[in-house]
From Swiss-Prot:
Domain of life: Eukaryota
Domain CRIB: 23-37
GO cellular component terms, A-Z: cytoplasm; cytoskeleton; endomembrane system; plasma membrane
Origin species: Mus musculus (Mouse)
Keyword Ribonucleoprotein: no
Biological processes per GO annotation: JNK cascade; positive regulation of actin filament polymerization; positive regulation of pseudopodium assembly; regulation of cell shape; Rho protein signal transduction
Chief location category: membrane
Protein name: Cdc42 effector protein 5
Annotated positions of the Omega-N-methylarginine modification: R38
SMART domains: PBD
């Protein structure tokens, strides 16, 4: 393994500057039409995200557009394609924490809530009350990172 020379305080480390010139230009194929930066910003062709793989469905009853030089045999009528609603999976968010992770999160949240209500003079909540489903630990002073092992 090569030995790296340590730079002293008089010689600061040089980092590679990443800019517009360090990103490869789009090559015209699907893989290189969109670039996503480290901050999540995207640039390039993002039209495929809004189309879901094709143009809008043809109007019902409208004749199909056929090039004048090609003759296609008549096709059998097909059932109409269901158009996805705007609230399809793109706008919904589902997170499954699982039973043990959910219990740990609820226990920490309830412990914090009970600590804040215990400091109020007129609070009638019981201090150190955990969520009824909490089985993770009896010490409610643990932070969430400690409970889940981070």
């Amino acid at each position: 393994m090569p030995v790296m020379k340590q730079l002293g305080p008089a010689q600061p480390k040089k980092r590679l500057d990443r800019g517009a010139l360090s990103i490869s230009a789009p090559l015209g194929d699907f893989r290189h039409t969109l670039h996503v930066g480290r901050g999540g910003d995207a640039f390039g062709d993002t039209s495929f995200l809004s189309r879901h793989g094709g143009g809008p469905p043809p109007e019902p009853g409208a004749p199909p557009v056929v090039a004048p030089h090609s003759v296609a045999p008549p096709a059998a009528p097909q059932p109409p394609v269901a158009v996805p609603s705007p609230a399809d999976p793109l706008l919904s968010f589902h997170l499954d924490l699982g039973p043990s992770m959910l219990d740990a999160v609820l226990g920490v949240m309830d412990a914090e809530r009970s600590e804040t209500t215990a400091t109020k003079p007129d609070g009638d909540a019981h201090p150190r009350v955990q969520h009824p489903k909490t089985r993770c630990c009896s010490n409610a002073d643990l932070q969430l990172d400690d409970v889940i092992g981070l």
